């Protein structure tokens, strides 16, 4: 997968290219990330990249000319078929379904805004989609872009040691993940659930699904509203709810 990034702070993306899962993906040639800095497309000695908005008001906007030239340079490098995304609070909120959709693209260009944003006409003429990572304000689009790169790259074949890791993540099937345990078997008096030590994989999978359904019901019940649960899942959820109620009243 190839990802182009337009950012005034390309150095920030070393966190993605040099470390962790994404760093290994880059090293192994599974993921390629290239950055363009709009400052490199300025023609004044101050390398100006911001300008005042028409109509007044606080703050500045990213200057059109260097931003557009950076976008065009990225598009040229990408060739045909690259989807251009602007990370914006006004965009579609990123969730696991959206990540899966984005992961089907071979090429993405991510535009990281700064200041008060970018000229609306640039959005209309250069941007294919706007995406947001949540209803809160950040100083720029770099962290949202890194979030998107990290989540999307997990679906590139070969990036994870076990592809099942991506398939079993929280939200992969619309549910939160189940609890996980490792050694020691007893920690401060708290024991690992016996079923996980049983070696019975059918029972382990059943327990994990029940915990996943129950955790979603407790923490993110709205997620269940959009899911078509199987008969088995309904039974497991009812079991969890009954057990939870019993524990709460004891």
Swiss-Prot record:
Catalytic activity: guanosine(37) in tRNA + S-adenosyl-L-methionine = N(1)-methylguanosine(37) in tRNA + S-adenosyl-L-homocysteine + H(+)
GO MF annotations in UniProt: tRNA (guanine(37)-N1)-methyltransferase activity
Main subcellular location: cytoplasm
UniProt-annotated binding residues for S-adenosyl-L-methionine: 113, 133-138
Cleaved signal peptide residues: none
SUPFAM superfamilies, alphabetized: alpha/beta knot
Example GO biological process: tRNA N1-guanine methylation
Name of the top EC class for this enzyme: transferase
Alphabetically ordered keywords of this record: Cytoplasm, Methyltransferase, S-adenosyl-L-methionine, Transferase, tRNA processing
Keyword GTP-binding appears in the UniProt entry: no
Biological role stated in the UniProt entry: Specifically methylates guanosine-37 in various tRNAs.
NCBIfam families xref list: PRK00026.1, trmD
Protein name: tRNA (guanine-N(1)-)-methyltransferase
């Amino acid at each position: 997968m190839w990802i182009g990034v337009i950012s005034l702070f390309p150095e920030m993306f070393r966190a993605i290219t040099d470390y962790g899962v994404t760093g290994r993906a880059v090293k192994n040639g599974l993921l390629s990330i290239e950055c363009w800095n709009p400052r490199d497309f300025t023609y004044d000695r101050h390398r100006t990249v911001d300008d005042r908005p028409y109509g007044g008001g606080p703050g500045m906007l990213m200057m059109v000319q260097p931003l557009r030239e950076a976008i065009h340079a990225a598009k040229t490098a990408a060739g045909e078929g690259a989807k251009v995304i602007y990370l914006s609070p006004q965009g579609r909120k990123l969730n696991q379904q959206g990540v899966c959709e984005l992961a089907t693209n071979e090429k993405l260009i991510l535009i990281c805004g700064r200041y008060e944003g970018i000229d609306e006409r640039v959005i209309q003429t250069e941007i294919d989609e706007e995406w947001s990572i949540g209803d809160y304000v950040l100083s720029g689009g770099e962290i949202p872009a890194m979030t998107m790169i990290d989540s999307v790259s997990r679906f590139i074949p070969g990036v994870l040691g076990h592809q099942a890791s991506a398939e079993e993540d929280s939200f992969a099937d619309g549910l939160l993940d189940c609890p996980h345990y490792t050694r020691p078997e007893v920690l401060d008096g708290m024991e690992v659930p016996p079923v996980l030590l049983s070696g019975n994989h059918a029972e382990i999978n059943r327990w994990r699904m029940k915990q996943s359904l129950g955790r979603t019901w407790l923490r993110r019940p709205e997620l269940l509203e959009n899911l078509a649960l199987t008969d088995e899942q309904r039974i497991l959820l009812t079991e969890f709810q009954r057990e939870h109620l019993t524990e709460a009243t004891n």
